[in-house]
């Protein structure tokens, strides 16, 4: 299993968080996510959570959770594939809980579009689709979609549904399998 966030805790002293490295070039997710969007989201926003936590600046719980959630989000992305569908264990999991990938996407979209404001939408290990309305560390995440404006507004403006629809083209199902 991936070690999504690396930090050492000795007593109450937290030493450092590290930003996960991308396994793809910043322009590799185009046209689903632009290089500009990745530069801002990964290169500035995510890095800021890590840096603020490491410097003890601001709300440490918020910054740690923001770093954690982004460390779950970015590794699950890959170069776009129009025919991208779940494989292996993730396919079996989705079929067991939702009967089909299409049903899963419909249910995920329903939950995401029902989330008022910003947050995260994720598939949990118990088969439920859940939301996080602010930054919180969760230990049951299988697949996670960033639903904050910074994730979609640059490329999709007000088309949140289009952002989600296109996201299925860039999910790396091997990573999702590893989380099961």
Please describe what each predicted stretch is.
Residues 2-180:
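Feature for soluble, non-membrane regions of globular proteins
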């Amino acid at each position: 299993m991936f070690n999504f966030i690396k930090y050492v805790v000795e007593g109450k002293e937290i030493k450092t968080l590290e930003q996960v490295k991308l396994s793809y070039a910043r322009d590799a997710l185009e046209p689903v996510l632009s290089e500009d969007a990745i530069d801002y989201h990964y290169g500035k926003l995510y890095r800021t959570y890590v840096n603020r936590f490491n410097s003890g600046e601001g709300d440490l719980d918020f910054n740690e959770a923001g770093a954690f959630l982004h460390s779950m989000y970015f590794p699950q992305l890959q170069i776009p594939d129009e025919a991208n569908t779940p494989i292996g264990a993730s396919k079996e999991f989705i079929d067991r809980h939702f009967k089909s990938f299409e049903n899963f996407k419909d249910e995920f979209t329903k939950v995401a579009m029902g989330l008022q404001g910003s947050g995260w939408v994720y598939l949990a290990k118990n088969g439920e689709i859940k939301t996080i309305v602010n930054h919180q560390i969760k230990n049951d995440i299988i697949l996670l979609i960033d639903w904050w404006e910074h994730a979609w507004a640059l490329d999709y403006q007000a088309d949140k549904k289009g952002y989600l629809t296109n996201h299925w083209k860039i999910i790396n199902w091997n990573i999702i399998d590893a989380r099961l």
